Amino acid sequence: MKTNVTLIGMPASGKSTLGQRLAEALDFEFVDVDRIIEAEEKRLLKEIIAQEGDDGFLEIENRINAALKMDGCVIAPGGSVIYGAEAMEHLRDISICLLYTSDAA
């Protein structure tokens, strides 16, 4: 049984806000993958993009999302996660993926 929920959506669509509420309702942990990327890379996302370029950032994002190991979590990856084939396959394997849309996006 899949024990995670992953929210897929556009940047700034409200995935983190919804994710925190959903995690609380399900008694799950909330995971913001952007924060994991920053912690692992020891740089802010904007610094990674400035130094590595868009393609370099996408490679890092794909690698980190494809390596996530967790149970009982609501996962909010960045909006560009959909460009990482390995990441998307892994997220489908470890979670129920939901497409979140919002008028705010």
Where are these regions (language model features)?
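Hydrophobic anchor at the beta1->P-loop junction of P-loop NTPases
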Residues: 7
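Conserved small/polar residues in nucleotide/adenosyl-binding loops
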Residues: 100-105
